């Protein structure tokens, strides 16, 4: 915490009116090409912030989509069976909406939920029609969309949205179990009315977490650190997803490649990727260190970007084949996504190994299992 206190002192002029340094000091437009679009000053600030962390600090983060929350509610009555892979269907619908981002449908989620299902049906009909322009590239997608459309036609238009706050805490509980952390306290940034328990606190308790409290970030430096890191991850992730999202229906039948601007890095910008890579991918490794729902593409792409950037020894190595780096990243990211899909084919739950001693570990029911 002393290192973070030094960071706040050094950049005291960047504090907001509450006396905090927020991730809002980095505007979203500055992430257009990831860290390649950072100016020298922002590179220095982020470098100093990432230097606060070391290999002994535990971090956990969850990546989720509001679209996925809604899709899970619509299809809550659909379970996996020999006739239908409900999880794959939910994933495919979420991916389609995230990838193509149809504005009217996204808008209806918040403004007119009753129109959402009909809009969804029309969207898939339109996509099937457009995909016929490039059947070789879009054949599998078209088959999936036709199956989805058949299911959507059987669903009632009655829809009520209730946002669910449990998923991030479910992942956090799994992380604690995996790392064997029993002695902990969880302070949640207070939201809503001062005298009333927040929905996030209730969700954490319902998941089964203990030692819970709510606090103000002005009083807890740990909350400020977590808020800053979460904001940076979220903005870098959004910049990446925006770059890979189709901007018009006309271009949606072509392959989407990460813009060359992402790879026009200097050494200091490349070093930011390497620092973030070690923090997220190397230090305190764990299966549940990062967590997502059925739709995990964004998280996989994010981790792929960090791994891809980290493998370069210098910017000269990038520049030697600059025009092809987008294609290379696309191939690498697709390989990681395929590995994820292969794991999803196995519906058996993955249980992390919790060491008990050098000869044994505890399973999820507390039983002692020898290696």
Question: Language-model segments: which ranges?
Answer:
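An N-terminal structural lobe/cap that precedes and organizes the functional/catalytic core
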Residues: 1-38, 44-62, 367-371
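A structural signal for well-ordered alpha-helical scaffolds and beta->alpha junctions
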Residues: 42-43, 222
């Amino acid at each position: 915490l002393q290192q973070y206190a030094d960071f706040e002192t050094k950049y005291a002029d960047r504090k907001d009116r509450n006396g905090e340094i927020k991730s809002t000091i980095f505007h979203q437009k500055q992430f257009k090409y990831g860290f390649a679009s950072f100016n020298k000053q922002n590179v220095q600030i982020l470098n100093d912030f990432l230097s606060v962390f070391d290999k002994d600090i535990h971090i956990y983060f969850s990546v989720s989509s509001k679209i996925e929350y809604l899709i899970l509610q619509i299809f809550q009555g659909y379970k996996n069976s020999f006739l239908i892979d409900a999880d794959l269907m939910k994933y495919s619908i979420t991916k389609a909406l995230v990838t193509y981002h149809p504005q009217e449908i996204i808008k209806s989620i918040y403004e007119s939920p009753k129109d959402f299902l009909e809009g969804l049906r029309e969207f898939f009909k339109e996509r099937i029609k457009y995909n016929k322009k490039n059947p070789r590239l879009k054949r599998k997608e078209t088959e999936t969309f036709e199956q989805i459309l058949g299911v959507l036609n059987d669903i009632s238009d009655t829809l009520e949205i209730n946002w669910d706050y449990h998923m991030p805490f479910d992942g956090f509980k799994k992380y604690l179990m995996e790392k064997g952390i029993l002695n902990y306290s969880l302070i949640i940034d207070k939201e809503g009315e001062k005298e009333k328990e927040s929905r996030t606190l209730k969700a954490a308790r319902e998941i089964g977490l203990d030692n819970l409290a709510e606090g103000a970030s002005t009083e807890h430096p740990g909350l400020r650190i977590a808020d800053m890191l979460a904001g940076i991850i979220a903005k870098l992730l959004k910049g990446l997803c925006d770059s890979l999202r189709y901007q018009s229906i006309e271009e949606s039948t072509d392959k989407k490649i990460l813009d060359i601007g992402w790879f026009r890095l200097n050494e200091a910008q490349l070093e930011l990727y390497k620092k973030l890579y070690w923090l997220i991918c190397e230090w305190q490794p764990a299966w549940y260190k990062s967590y997502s729902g059925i739709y995990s593409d964004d998280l996989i792409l994010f981790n792929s970007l960090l791994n891809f950037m980290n493998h370069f020894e210098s910017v000269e190595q990038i520049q030697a084949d600059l025009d092809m780096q987008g294609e290379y990243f696309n191939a690498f990211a697709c390989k990681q996504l395929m590995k994820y899909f292969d794991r999803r084919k196995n519906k058996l739950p993955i249980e992390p190994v919790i060491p008990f001693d050098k000869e044994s570990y505890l399973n999820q029911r507390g039983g002692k299992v020898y290696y």
